[in-house]
């Protein structure tokens, strides 16, 4: 074995040496940094050294190095402008925001009525049946045990409220996200425009974009749904674009050569081939939406998130852990239903 490894090392050394020699002899391959990069690096290095030396050698002589030069009025004026802009937007777009609120409330009220007013045994059986059909009998048994946990500990109604809010946000995100992803897959410039916006939606802390949502829609369930959509709605768009761009070009060319129309190409070729990846995006949207349950409770959403929030406020460790486990079980059940046998 030692001799074999030694021979492999000698052969590999010769091969790598030849490749390195070829790389050095090839003038078309750029080596090192460009002259402009060297000059910029030297220039900024000198600036850093000079100002750092001045600051630590004469700390009181050059005061502008201690604090960034600004004026308090700049922030006050900026705050005033933003508040004026929001007040104007609320007044001018009152009917627009009311329409959005009405649409969200309609879906949410229907789902809450469905999950809360329907007998628990019907919902229990339906969820177990869906999980069994999607992921198999073992997953159905597991989901039944998760639901039994919520019922025995008194979390049933809270869990149904949470699932209703989550399904509202996920449903709206999906029906808006998939068409948007289809449109972006054929419009690279538009996708390049909205991609930074989606990055902003996912990276910005929820407490920051919670402020304009409350300013436009107030506190309550509508604001909770919108906050959940902002954070959890982007994966379905990204995955739809990725899935449609990954459809083999030879398959599309074959369909076009047989006279397939754009609608036929989309519905019979692209979407069926892209469906597994799109469903992965749907799964990510559902699970990311569920992570906003506790944050949504800060703006008036009830459910399991409120239980966790109260446990944090009163340092009730037991209540927080039990409610957190219930949220985890909701996520696992939804994951099994959406993903099916892939995760079984």
Region spans (language model):
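Short amphipathic alpha-helical coupling elements at transmembrane boundaries
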Residues: 18-25, 102, 106-113, 146-150, ...
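Alpha-helical transmembrane segments of multi-pass membrane proteins
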Residues: 4-10, 153, 231-238, 327-335
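Transmembrane helix recognition focused on a "late"/terminal membrane span
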Residues: 2-56
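Hydrophobic, membrane-inserted alpha-helices
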Residues: 1, 121-129, 143-148, 208-212, ...
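Generic hydrophobic transmembrane alpha-helix motif, especially the helices
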Residues: 165-168, 172-178, 182-185, 195-232
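Transmembrane-helix boundary motif in ABC transporter permease subunits
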Residues: 127-134, 146-157, 169-198
